[in-house]
């Protein structure tokens, strides 16, 4: 197969996405999303839809994107590798946070995860 016809297949998952549905569920907007922390403190690790969009852009611009073929990657994982950030300048790593903090029953603290 020539490089012109090569394809890469991967799975990209966002972290805890601040989608319109999530914002509506908490009665907040993208501008006021931190107010939702009163109801769900772990929502502090959430990411904007732009963050996963930036992951797609980074993949599209990578001439070596085939290294991801057959893999499942997260927006937080790719942010560390490609260096992009969320709208607030952070790099939320929701999946690591969910395992190490939320699932472990620890209080909400995004230090080292955002």
Name each region found by the language model.
Residues 24-25, 71:
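Residue-level signal for well-ordered alpha-helical positions
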Residues 1-4, 60-61:
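Alpha-helical segments that scaffold the active site and NAD(P)H-binding pocket
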Residues 26-31:
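Short, hinge-like loop/turn segments at secondary-structure boundaries
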Residues 11, 32-114:
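C-terminal helical subdomain
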Residues 14-24:
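Short, flexible catalytic-loop segment of classical short-chain dehydrogenase/reductase
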Residues 4-15:
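Conserved beta-loop-beta element that borders a ligand/cofactor-binding pocket
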């Amino acid at each position: 197969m020539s490089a012109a016809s090569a394809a890469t297949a991967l799975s990209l998952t966002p972290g805890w996405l601040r989608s319109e549905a999530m914002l509506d569920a908490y009665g907040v907007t993208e501008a006021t999303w931190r107010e939702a922390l009163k109801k769900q403190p772990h929502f502090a690790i959430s990411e904007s839809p732009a963050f996963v969009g930036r992951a797609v852009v980074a993949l599209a611009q990578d001439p070596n994107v085939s290294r991801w073929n057959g893999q499942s990657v997260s927006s937080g994982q790719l942010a560390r590798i490609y260096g992009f950030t969320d709208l607030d300048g952070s790099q939320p790593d929701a999946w690591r946070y969910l395992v190490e903090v939320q699932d472990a029953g620890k209080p909400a603290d995004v230090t080292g995860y955002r």
